Amino acid sequence: MKHDLETLKHIIDSSNRITFFTGAGVSVASGVPDFRSMGGLFDEISKDGLSPEYLLSRDYLEDDPEGFINFCHKRLLFVDTMPNIVHDWIAKLERNQQSLGVITQNIDGLHSDAGSQHVDELHGTLNRFYCNVCHKSYTKSDVIDRTLKHCDNCGGAIRPDIVLYGEMLDQPTIIRALNKIEHADTLVVLGSSLVVQPAAGLISHFKGDNLIIINKDRTPYDSDATLVIHDDMVSVVKSLMTE
């Protein structure tokens, strides 16, 4: 492990076009449940009696807008979450002009909360909301502080700005993410199993020098990586910052 940390530190220190790609494992230490792991959010949602895929779908929003927004308020609004040391480390490298930014599969908005400026949120964010009918925009504080569920303009359901099952990923976001990956000299994957498509397929566009994967479990890209560390991200970053 010590040798891996030394290698990681050397690669990071010698890179000036790092792109980060993050998944659910990065936010677990902030209290955000992993969607798919045992005991994660999907397991909790299943207790509501409907499939997680349906409850997080465009179909459910259209079939039962009231049920959809009540579900979002009950299960998705992570009110007390704060960025952890991994989010802070990524933001610091961007401020130091070593990083092109971060691409994330997460919807918690914690990269932006940590100060990262160049964030491509592939699946949207819970930091923004809008009316499903008239598309009026709302902030997270509008929804949480005022417990606002219906648009004050037209009465429509206020939904989070996330990509639901049955919806397409935002193409401008995909293009920006591809640009970050194609121009990176180092791509650091953190806390992602790299199996959720089409987002995970972006990794195949990396042509730079160093692919680094830090994840508790194996990924389909491990054999292509310069360095693989199967460990907790928070522990790795803490150790890295004390080297």
UniProtKB/Swiss-Prot annotation:
Please report the name of this protein according to its UniProt entry.
Answer: NAD-dependent protein deacetylase
Q: Which cofactor does it need?
A: Zn(2+)
Matching entries from PROSITE patterns are given as: SIRTUIN
UniProt keywords (A-Z) are: Cytoplasm, Metal-binding, NAD, Transferase, Zinc
Summarize the protein's role. Answer: NAD-dependent protein deacetylase which modulates the activities of several enzymes which are inactive in their acetylated form.
Entry's InterPro entries?
Answer: DHS-like_NAD/FAD-binding_dom (IPR029035), NAD-dep_sirtuin_deacylases (IPR050134), Sirtuin (IPR003000), Sirtuin_cat_small_dom_sf (IPR026591), Sirtuin_class_U (IPR028628), Ssirtuin_cat_dom (IPR026590)
**Location of the active site:** H123 (proton acceptor)
Specify the species. Staphylococcus aureus (strain NCTC 8325 / PS 47)
Q: What is its EC number?
A: 2.3.1.286
What one GO molecular function would you report for this record? Answer: histone deacetylase activity, NAD-dependent
Q: Which SUPFAM superfamilies match?
A: DHS-like NAD/FAD-binding domain (SSF52467)
Q: Which residues bind NAD(+)?
A: A24, F35, R36, Q105, I107, D108, H123, S192, S193, N215, D232
The record lists the catalysed reaction(s) as: N(6)-acetyl-L-lysyl-[protein] + NAD(+) + H2O = 2''-O-acetyl-ADP-D-ribose + nicotinamide + L-lysyl-[protein]
Which residues participate in nicotinamide binding? F35, I107, D108
Q: Which family does it belong to?
A: Belongs to the sirtuin family. Class U subfamily.
What NCBIfam families does the database record attribute to this sequence?
Answer: PRK00481.1-1
| PANTHER family referenced in this protein's UniProt entry, alphabetically | NAD-DEPENDENT PROTEIN DEACYLASE, NAD-DEPENDENT PROTEIN DEACYLASE SIRTUIN-5, MITOCHONDRIAL-RELATED
Question: What does the Swiss-Prot or TrEMBL cofactor note state?
Answer: Binds 1 zinc ion per subunit.
Annotated Gene Ontology cellular component terms: cytoplasm
Where does the UniProt annotation locate this protein?
A: Cytoplasm
